Amino acid sequence: PSDVVARIVADGMSKHLGQTMVIENVGGAGGTLGSGRVASAEADGYTLLAGSMGSHVAAPVLTPNVRYDSERDFIPIGITADAPAVIVARKDFPANNMKEFVAYVKANGDKVKQAHGGVGSSSHMACL
């Protein structure tokens, strides 16, 4: 969702500032690749990051080789969106609600696979 939110915010900022905001979506590693790029960019006043709790709180703890320090390299400006996490499965999955899902995972954890945006991403944390 960071890319979508960034584009919506950039559109409003462009109108307000009277200049184009360019969005460069750097995907991969739960947002840590883009965060690392912004952390090492020249401090020009024009480079901003649409990050997440995953890339700035969870990933640095779970991934020892991130190329930035969230507290040292960034300053929070504001919250732009609140995106709830959802868990979905194939229609033929043997659980129809969260209670059944939790019971199934407890009994069959080795059979359950998850898809997420990277270690430490909000979708990864929601699946834990």
Task: State what each model feature region is.
Residues 1-8, 27-29, 115-122:
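Extracytoplasmic "Venus flytrap"
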Residues 2-18, 127-128:
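Short, polar/charged alpha-helical segment
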Residues 8, 36-37:
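Active-site signature of alpha/beta-hydrolase-fold catalytic machinery across serine-
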Residues 13, 40-45, 61-128:
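Hinge/capping helix and adjacent helix->loop/strand transition within the periplasmic-binding protein
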Residues 20-36:
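Early extracytoplasmic/lumenal segment of secretory-pathway proteins
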Residues 25-27, 51-52, 90, 117:
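Active-site-proximal beta-strand/loop segments in catalytic clefts of secreted hydrolases
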Residues 32-35, 56-61, 124:
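Adenylate-forming
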Residues 45-51:
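Paired acidic/hydrophobic, glycine-rich loop segments that form the ligand-binding mouth/hinge
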